[in-house]
A protein has these predicted regions:
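Short, flexible, solvent-exposed loop/turn segments with mixed acidic/basic and small polar residues
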Residues: 1, 61-64
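Vicinal oxygen chelate
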Residues: 1-3, 6-15, 33, 45-48, 63-126
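Core segments of cupin and vicinal oxygen chelate
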Residues: 2-5, 11-53
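A short beta-turn/loop motif at secondary-structure boundaries
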Residues: 37-39, 63-65, 99-101
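Short, charged/polar, Gly/Pro-enriched secondary-structure boundary elements
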Residues: 52-56, 113-116
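Membrane-topology and secretion signals of cell-surface/extracellular proteins
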Residues: 55, 66, 70, 119-125
Length: 126
């Protein structure tokens, strides 16, 4: 059984990072809680959305698929390895990952309607 503990983040794809940052940080006053450049000019920025949740914006495109992470939600799970095993045992295709980053682990699947659903686990120091 997958143990979901919170909504980890929601993702919005942006085409102009500077314009998006001006809007989210300047206009809306959101505070940056993570700012990572995956590759030159390819950004993943998370804004504090209260509690363990964040709003992520990105212009990142996967080098394997030339597609950006699609808008979607990420579920924070307390049992990441078990969640990954449960998804695989159910025959659900992993569409992104599994990935290990400095602050977290994450993978994605498609729901029955083709929406991206991410499973996420923050590392203890995060």
């Amino acid at each position: 059984m997958i143990n979901v503990t919170a909504l980890a983040f929601a993702i919005s794809h942006v085409t102009d990072v500077a314009r998006a940052r001006k809007f989210y940080e300047g206009t809306l006053g959101l505070k940056v809680c993570m700012d990572m450049e995956f590759a030159p000019g390819k950004w993943w920025i998370e804004y504090d959305a209260g509690g363990p949740s964040a709003l992520a914006i990105t212009n990142f495109e996967s080098p394997n698929t030339n597609t950006a992470p699609s808008p979607g939600v990420a579920l924070e799970v307390s049992n990441y390895d078990e969640a990954l095993a449960a998804v695989r045992a159910a025959g659900i295709a992993i569409t992104w990952g599994p990935n290990e980053f400095s602050l977290c682990h994450c993978f994605a699947v498609k729901d029955p309607d083709g929406n991206d659903l991410y499973f996420h686990r923050r590392k203890p120091a995060a």
